[in-house]
Amino acid sequence: MTPKILVIIPAFNEEESIGKVINDIPKELVSEVVVVNNNSTDGTPANAASAGATVINEVRMGYGYACLKGISYAKNKSENERPDIIVFLDGDYSDYPEEIRELIRPIIEDNIDIVIGSRTLGNAEKGALLPQQVFGNAIATKLIKWLYGVEFTDLGPFRAIKLDKLLQLNMTDTTYGWTVEMQVKAAKEKFKCTEVPVSYRKRIGASKIAGTISGSIKAGYKILLTIFKYL
């Protein structure tokens, strides 16, 4: 049986890029694209709807809040419409949505539980990953391997996971620690984890987190806090 795949895109003020992201998603693979509008003040929701996405709103600001809203939407669908696999994808066009094929393949073919799209293993455009992101990824993934025994190379947001496994993780983070919480909990629960190389380019528009010193410090602190929280 062909699995149902739902894509969740948290989005805050991504009017320039959101249509491009949605248009590049392989429609033959995906049953629904859900854009979680996180209090955008621009044309993000209208552009997402015009591109064919389902748009839902989350007024509480935070990447994790938006992702949790998307999960709730997926979980509450009727049994015959409920997705088997959730793909998380950012709305800034830094990832390559067409690589969803490679991202979901280990789940479908090898019964893997969670797949992380690794920019470290893939091809990142020069300057797309800021120095603080590269450094933070290296430190965080080494700590996860040391403390939880699972080797990752990236904490990137482009990822796929079985819905039943995602619900089992009982995700709670509402801000910067979202991706690392998922990986740490998956490692702790002994989920079957793997990574696939993905491409990465400079985002459209300015980064809301890594592009500022204060954002980078807050994100780094939250990531470290989350890694140690679940020991």
Where are these regions (language model features)?
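Cell-envelope/extracellular polymer assembly enzymes that use nucleotide-activated donors
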Residues: K4-L6, E181
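Short beta-strand/loop segment that forms part of the nucleotide-sugar
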Residues: I9, V21-I22, V30-S40
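Short, well-formed alpha-helical segments that are part of the catalytic scaffolds
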Residues: N13-K27
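Acidic helix N-cap motif at the loop->helix transition within catalytic regions
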Residues: E16-K20, D42-A51
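Conserved donor nucleotide-binding strand/loop of the catalytic core
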Residues: S31-V34, P45-N80
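A conserved acidic beta->alpha catalytic loop
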Residues: N37-A46, Y93
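Acceptor/aglycone-binding surface of glycosyltransferases and processive sugar-polymer synthases
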Residues: V59-M61, Y65-Y73, P97-Y176, K202-S214, ...
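Short beta-strand-to-loop acidic/aromatic patch adjacent to the donor-nucleotide binding site
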Residues: N80-S94
